[in-house]
Regions:
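Ligand/substrate-recognition segments at binding pockets and active sites
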Residues: 67, 203-257
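Structural transition elements
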Residues: 168, 172-205, 216-223
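Exposed, low-complexity coil/turn segments of extracytoplasmic
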Residues: 19-63, 79, 109, 155
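Short, well-ordered beta-strand elements
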Residues: 31-38, 58-63, 70-72, 86-92, ...
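Alpha-helical secondary-structure segments
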Residues: 34, 87, 132-175, 209-221, ...
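Ligand-site clamp/hinge motif
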Residues: 77-119
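Short, solvent-exposed loop/beta-turn-alpha elements that line the ligand-binding surface or hinge
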Residues: 48-65, 81-86, 120-130, 139-147, ...
């Protein structure tokens, strides 16, 4: 009898293995997730690459596009594992302060949070945070040919003060292009302030060479630019801040890949540092990054995450990955689930 049951069990096991997989149906809870972003996308068609809206492709399909104003994505009925939501509505070009107000008033479900907004986040408010995926750096124009002025400014910047006060300790202080979580060696790049050496370098410059203009493109970076200018003054440099393309720019580049070599290539391209050679080991990757930063053409300052404030009715796992990709397919809204 025992032998017979063993044979039957073997036959049944083989049948189960041979059966084709049946796509698992998912419940349809419905509802519209209301998202606000500050990006002002004026293109004729919705973006097809990058982070944010393009991440919805596959699970959702675009059904309405109002350039610079609004995008609506509806659940893709053909997707394997249909989203719980019926749709996602994204309001574009919303200032961070207004986003935070809309979240507090229940007019939005997911909003972006900057350092100023994080100060005012109510206790217990749910947030989603990516890994530090934004590189904030100073990049010198080609016309700034004297390496001494570049090094003097690099040594004068007090990253710790900016990080603690202006950034609310968000992200990480860094002197590297790649964040520590990705490369494992970012700590080897110095972030120390050395005012005596900075002053010594500045003292050897002509009066004209000590005058620099600092430009920025993103208004969120203005407070950091102002603090960098104050630090520069302590080193004997005169830095004026404006939104134009200055002698040095305060810029932000995004980590687009979890592969360190590809990520370094993308950041180097975004900062106009050239294309690093292909790295086939952590040691060669470190050497290439060190070569890109020699001469202080670019001075990394911080690595910052994406941070989102999330409304109370949003349920499910975090809607962003470590790289900041949107993953809304497993979210549902309270009151729409039986």
């Amino acid at each position: 009898m025992e032998r017979m049951w063993s044979r039957w069990f073997a036959v049944l096991s083989a049948l189960v293995i041979a059966m084709p997989a049946v796509p698992r149906s998912r419940p349809r809870y419905g509802g519209t997730l209301r998202v606000e972003v500050r990006a002002d996308i004026e293109t004729a068609d919705p973006p097809a690459s990058g982070r944010g809206l393009p991440d919805l492709a596959g699970e959702f399909t675009i059904t309405r596009w109002e350039a610079g104003r609004r995008a609506v994505y509806s659940a893709n009925e053909s997707a394997v594992g249909r989203p719980f939501l019926d749709s996602v509505e994204i309001q574009l070009a919303r200032p961070l302060r207004e986003q935070a107000i809309d979240l507090d008033l229940g007019r939005a479900d997911v909003v972006e949070l900057g350092p100023n907004e994080l100060r005012r986040v109510a206790a217990g408010r749910k947030t989603w945070t990516s890994a530090p995926v934004h590189v904030v750096a100073l990049v010198f124009a080609a016309r700034v040919t004297d390496a001494r002025v570049r090094e003097a400014l690099a040594l004068a910047v007090d990253r710790s003060a900016i990080h603690n006060v202006l950034l609310q300790r968000q992200g990480e202080i860094s002197g590297a292009l790649l964040p520590q979580w990705l490369s494992g060696y970012a700590f080897l790049f110095s972030t120390a302030v050395d005012l005596p050496k900075a002053r010594s370098l500045a003292a050897g410059l002509s009066p004209a060479a000590r005058v620099l203009s600092l430009g920025f493109e993103d208004a969120r970076l203005r407070p950091i630019a102002d603090r960098v200018a104050l630090n520069a003054r302590d080193a004997g440099l005169a830095v004026s801040v404006g939104t134009s393309n200055g002698d040095v720019r305060l810029v932000e580049a995004r980590i687009e890949s979890a592969d360190p070599a590809r990520a370094l290539s993308g950041v180097a391209k975004a900062l106009s540092l050239g294309e690093p050679a292909h790295a086939d080991s952590p040691e060669s990757l470190y050497a290439f990054e060190r070569a890109l930063l020699d001469g202080y053409r670019a001075v990394p300052l911080f690595h910052l995450p994406d941070v989102y404030g999330v409304g109370a009715r949003v349920k499910g796992p975090p809607g962003v990955t470590s790289l900041g990709e949107w993953r809304f397919g497993d979210l549902w809204l309270e009151g729409n689930r039986p």
